[in-house]
Structure formats: structure tokens, C-alpha cells
């Protein structure tokens, strides 16, 4: 389920190119968009939630610069790593050319105890749904 976005001036640094942390943030937008498209209301999911999903690892690699006005598309795949951890791998395209790739690893914890807990059923279903899309090539 691709996510499309225009690069804004606020996404760029003093040199006029997208700042690396901003592209990671835009990748996170794609993740949130996917959750919403699946029917997970993010506001309700995290409001007084017994679950938190901190990012424990993030990396990004650029193959060419992105500029204000560029329209990008982000595709990502998901991989379940354990009962409480998953990873998203993003590919960022400009006019069908991959210009960057990124990865984020998320862990499910109980926010007060700060201990790992199993992913909630809604996220397990979302992970399964995305895995099915990947397998069928949709």
C-alpha cells in the first residue's frame, strides 16, 4: 500500500536537500497511514493504552538527494521478529527510481513497567494482512 507525499521546504536543510531525520519521519507517516488504512484508530490505540511501541533501531541510506517540490512514493514491507517486535523496511521512490531506503525496528512494551509484552491482536492482524499483501504481490 504505497504512500505518496510532496517534499516541503520545512523538510529540507540549509543546503536545500531533505534532512535525513525528516525522511525517517516521513517514513513513519507511511507506517501511521497504513495503520489507519487497516482501520486502527491511532488516537484511540495510544490513548490511555497499556501498550507503547518505541523504535529501538532506525537507519536510512540515501542514493541521491531529495528537494523541495519532489513527489515521493514510499513502499514498505514488514517482518515480525518475535511476539513483541517487528521491523519495517521502506523503499523511497522518486519517479520510479529508488532514491533512499530505511528501516525501523519497533518493540511492544507496557509503558508503566517498561517491560516487553506481546503485540496486541490488532497489530498482529495488521502484520498478517501486510504479509499476505507481500506474498500475493499486491
UniProtKB/Swiss-Prot annotation:
Single GO molecular function: fatty acyl-CoA hydrolase activity
SUPFAM superfamilies the record matches: Thioesterase/thiol ester dehydrase-isomerase
Pathway in which this enzyme or protein is active: Cofactor biosynthesis; phylloquinone biosynthesis; Quinol/quinone metabolism; 1,4-dihydroxy-2-naphthoate biosynthesis; 1,4-dihydroxy-2-naphthoate from chorismate: step 7/7
UniProt EC number: 3.1.2.28
Enzyme kind, highest EC tier: hydrolase
GO biological process: phylloquinone biosynthetic process
Catalytic site: 13
Membrane-spanning ranges: none
Record field: catalytic activity: 1,4-dihydroxy-2-naphthoyl-CoA + H2O = 1,4-dihydroxy-2-naphthoate + CoA + H(+)
Entry keywords, A to Z: Hydrolase
Listed InterPro entries: 4-hydroxybenzoyl-CoA_TE, DHNA_CoA_hydrolase, HotDog_dom_sf, YbgC/YbaW
Function: Catalyzes the hydrolysis of 1,4-dihydroxy-2-naphthoyl-CoA (DHNA-CoA) to 1,4-dihydroxy-2-naphthoate (DHNA), a reaction involved in phylloquinone (vitamin K1) biosynthesis.
Family indicated by similarity: Belongs to the 4-hydroxybenzoyl-CoA thioesterase family. DHNA-CoA hydrolase subfamily.
Protein name (Swiss-Prot/TrEMBL): 1,4-dihydroxy-2-naphthoyl-CoA hydrolase
